[in-house]
């Protein structure tokens, strides 16, 4: 049975299955209760770094929490757009959803890398492991997406470029 799934598409679907629910839940918890949710396990490194190293007051800390939630929801939105694109076989075969996947991977990698660096600075080993794992998943998919190359467009193989019917005729006055 032939399949028309590209490796990067399949890997992107698996990543979307992880990141959409987890980052959506984390972002909505931040929206509901910014201070309480900011100090939970997925965000503790960012919260401690902001409060300890940047010495921000309560309102700027809440704004930073909302900014983190907005960034995570942006990644979730691009993963959702990728899933919508991947449902159509014609778009999936030509790699039409690769742009949405690439944007989700780029923004998600920046957020995970920054969170990992902040976890390293404040000494949160469990948060460091979580963000390093997320970063490795995102970078692994990005490498697969880059190595796989662009999708081949479907052309009519019956017509070749050497066919005389496709050549433009040259007239005496056209030279």
Please tell me what each predicted stretch does.
Residues 29-39, 82-95, 118-121, 151-154:
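Juxtamembrane transmembrane-helix termini
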Residues 58-75:
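Individual transmembrane alpha-helix segments
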Residues 19-29, 75-82, 108-115, 141:
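Helical transmembrane-bundle signal
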């Amino acid at each position: 049975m032939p399949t028309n799934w590209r490796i990067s598409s399949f890997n992107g679907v698996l990543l979307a299955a992880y990141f959409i629910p987890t980052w959506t839940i984390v972002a909505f918890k931040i929206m509901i209760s910014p201070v309480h949710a900011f100090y939970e396990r997925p965000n503790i490194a960012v919260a401690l770094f902001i409060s300890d190293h940047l010495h921000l007051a309560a309102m700027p800390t809440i704004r930073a929490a909302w900014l983190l939630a907005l960034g995570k929801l942006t990644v979730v939105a691009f993963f959702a757009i990728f899933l919508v694109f991947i449902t159509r076989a014609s778009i999936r075969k030509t790699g039409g959803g690769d742009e949405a996947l690439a944007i989700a991977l780029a923004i998600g990698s920046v957020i995970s890398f920054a969170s990992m660096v902040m976890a390293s600075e404040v000494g949160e080993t469990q948060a460091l492991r979580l963000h390093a794992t997320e970063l490795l998943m995102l970078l692994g998919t990005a490498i697969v997406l880059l190595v796989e190359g662009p999708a081949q467009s479907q052309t009519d193989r019956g017509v070749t470029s050497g066919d005389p019917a496709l050549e433009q005729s040259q007239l005496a006055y056209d030279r």
